[in-house]
Amino acid sequence: MADRMTPEQRHRCMSRIRGRDTKPELVVRRWLWHQGFRYRLYVKALPGRPDIVMRKWRTVIFVNGCFWHGHDCQSDRRPTTNAQFWQDKIDRNRERDTRNVAALQAAGWHVLVVWECQLNAKNRQQTLRELDVRLSQIVLEHTAGPKRYSEPDHCADLLVAAEPDQP
């Protein structure tokens, strides 16, 4: 089937597809801000240019659209026209996402992926609760490091002296 749009019309239509500040991203960003997390957006220096970067916790969050990133869910409806092109494109996107996640993890970053379908009205609260749990675990990992103080030598003797004698 021939394309019903001229190349100029197709270009104008495709150029309006947003890659930043999408509704799912804004939902996650507002929630993070209200929870007290501070972040940067679209840091170019990191592989994959993550949507949300929390440097303090070495955590990045990708908010992926189900169609563009090939999430196998009910929201992922592939076009029937030019199907091979779209399949190849989405496969390349998936491969790129896998490479970016691996590179970030190898560099010591925590990588979280939130899918568009997880933020619909039905699943949003559950998804944000799960995100809260995971971020809490990450924060605890970073704050529960080695103790910054040590016992004086004379205290170790006192503790031994207070223990009952062994028969």
Model-identified regions with their sequence ranges:
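Nucleic-acid endo/exonuclease domains
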Residues: 1-113, 117-167
